[in-house]
Every structure is written in structure tokens, then in C-alpha cells.
């Protein structure tokens, strides 16, 4: 009985790793067991055999230590290893960003954009032609702009001078008496016609022009150049005529007045260049076929009724002998 109780005490002490529970204390049971195992090793010259009645019991971890997860796989235990901590979130985000913006083999030569940026509001300019969906025999679009050496031709220079002069006159509210240079006599007639027809278009469509101006929201030169999108949209259906052209130039003059009112006169010339670029470089074939500005004058030619009436009255005054008084009143 005593032997059984003694073995139980030794077993309990060995399990708990503490001192002997017997009265008087004595040496720890664990120490005695280690000594006996060492003695058996020395006598046997090999591994110590387990003592009779001794049981192999796993020693629990120290108080406060985390129990090992024996069910965890090798991969899970690896991730929990203190020496292999997870990458901080900010470093992981930076790595992901670098991977996104620099896959040169997938971008096919395109330059990556910085993350978080949107492409500047982008110039969505389309080149419109009378055959927008058909290509030429050489594979190029009929509306392909001319090479740089052909851009500054007579039609372009004449058009730019007429349109620029009209926009400046509308902005200042006064006619420029200086003769046209490149445009010559034909340009002078075209400018006079544009003044007459364009002024009428602005009067008749002022409300619509105001709405279009608000949508453009012009604040800088880049916004001025976006005017080309309005022109492209107008010609998107492939229909070109002088009515549309004069309406667009008239709206350009309306915009020029606005630029003058907000002290942005320096944008008027870029506006005139934008209008000329779209008209001449995308509608060149049509303009040449219509004989350019001579055709414009002929299309909007209106018989000078006031001049005709004046001539009739003067002739009547001379025949009837009414005298110089009537001639003065009707001249």
C-alpha cells in the first residue's frame, strides 16, 4: 500500500514538475528520477531504460506560453513563425502598385499612368469626313489632314485672316478699317458677307449660344481648344453646308465677346486658329469644290434692295425736278 502511494506521489510530482508532496520536503522527485536515469546510463553504457512504473508524460508549457497548434499544417506553422512575419500593409500596397504600373511586357509600349490620377481630361477630337466610315484605296481616311508643308496654303491663310478679323471685331465692337493682307479683295467681300450674316445668326440664336457657352465653361486656353469638339459634333452626320459653317463661325464670335468681357482677349487668336483648323483641314475638299470664300459670298448674296430703291428714287427725282432736297434726304 505504501509502495503504491509512494509511486502515485512520484508520478504526480513528475507530471506537475514540482517538489515532493511528502512531509519534510526532501529533494524533488524529478531530480531523483534524473539521477537514477543517469546511474542506469553509466552502468549499462547506453540509453537508460525506463524505470518500472514510470510513465512518459509530456511536460506542459510554462504558465502564459501559447500552446503549440499540433493540428496546423507546415504552411500554417510557417506563417506563424516569429522569424517570418507578414509584410506590412503599406509595403504590400507599394509592391502591388509597382506591379500594376510596370508590366512592360503587357503594356505593349504604352507609358503607365500614375495611380490615383485620371488622365487629364482628355482631348476627344475626332476627324470627321464626308465618308467617315470608308477608307481610301491606299488605306488612309479621306479626311486625313495634309502634311505639314501643305498646311499653310492660300486657303488656310485666307480663312484664318477672315475668321480672325471677324472674331476680333465682334469682341471689340468696332470694325477694323485696315485692309486685309492675304485675303485681298475676295477676302474683303467675304468679311462683309460674314459681318452681315453672322450678326443676324447671333441675334436669332443668342439664347442657344448662351447655353452652349455655359457648357463649354471656358477658363483657359485648353478649354478654348475644346471648341473643336463642338464643331466635330456638328459635322458628325457627314452633312456640310455654308449654313452650318457660318453658324459655327458666328458662335465663335459669340465666344470671343465672352473672352473680352472676362479679360481673356489673348485666347481669341487661338480660338480663331482652332476654327480654321477644323474647317480647312477636315473640309478642304468640300471648300475647294465650293470655290472657297467666293462660293460663300455667292451663296449668301442678297440683292441690295435698299440700294435699288435709292437708285429708283434718285432717278425719279431727277425726272420730276423735285430738286436737291429730295436727293439729300434719300442719299
From Swiss-Prot:
A motif (BH2) lies at residues 285-300. PROSITE patterns: BCL2_FAMILY, BH1, BH2, BH3. Residues 85-156 are annotated as: PEST-like. Cleaved by CASP3 during apoptosis, yielding a pro-apoptotic C-terminal fragment. Rapidly degraded in the absence of phosphorylation in the PEST region. One of its GO terms (biological process) is extrinsic apoptotic signaling pathway in absence of ligand. A motif (BH1) lies at residues 234-253. Keywords: Apoptosis, Cytoplasm, Developmental protein, Differentiation, Isopeptide bond, Membrane, Mitochondrion, Nucleus, Phosphoprotein, Transmembrane, Transmembrane helix, Ubl conjugation. There is a cross-link at residues 117, 175, 178 (Glycyl lysine isopeptide (Lys-Gly) (interchain with G-Cter in ubiquitin)). It is a single-pass membrane protein. Pfam families: Bcl-2 (PF00452). Residues 130-154 are annotated as: Disordered. It is found in: Membrane; Cytoplasm; Mitochondrion; Nucleus, Nucleoplasm. A motif (BH3) lies at residues 190-204. One of its GO terms (molecular function) is protein heterodimerization activity. The modification Phosphoserine is found at residues 102, 140, 143. The modification Phosphothreonine is found at residue 144. The chain crosses the membrane at residues 308-330. The record marks 108-109, 138-139 as: Cleavage. Induction: Up-regulated by IL3 and CSF2. Up-regulated in murine embryonal carcinoma cells in response to retinoic acid treatment. Levels reach a maximum after 4 hours, are decreased after 8 hours and are back to maximum after 12 hours. Levels are decreased after 24 hours and back to basal levels after 48 hours. Expression remains constant in retinoic acid-treated embryonic stem cells. Involved in the regulation of apoptosis versus cell survival, and in the maintenance of viability but not of proliferation. Mediates its effects by interactions with a number of other regulators of apoptosis. Isoform 2 has antiapoptotic activity. Belongs to the Bcl-2 family. This is Induced myeloid leukemia cell differentiation protein Mcl-1 homolog. It comes from Mus musculus.
